[in-house]
Amino acid sequence: AFFSDANIIKSKVKGALADSPFGQFFSPGLAEGTNVEIVIRPQHVRIDFDRDGKGPLPTVSMGRPARGCVVRARFLGNESLVEFRMDFDNSIFKVTVPNVFLPKVGQPLWLTVPRDRCFVFPAY
């Protein structure tokens, strides 16, 4: 990736906001209808457990949760890399977690992303 390892969600600006499965992201200075990419680094994603098909409640700072199922988990020495197949578009979403975290393949988990750790850029 251009910046570093990152998850990219494509969106479009409407009313100064870019909508995504994780909720809306402020897009100041971008014109209405601009195609954008929401950039989310793997280390900034938070993981929460599934509660009978439900995730954590949405919050202003974390947006709404999006569900994915584990497709691979590896311990990399000082962190774990967990890859999810996301329910919203079947894409692969990468998350890094400090220490050992190795959920079973197929396990559904919920992901949230803190708004202050994500970036919205015009798509080229």
Language-model segments: which ranges?
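Non-catalytic connector elements of ABC transporters
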Residues: 6-124
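Conserved beta-strand-loop-alpha-helix hinge in the C-terminal portion
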Residues: 1-4
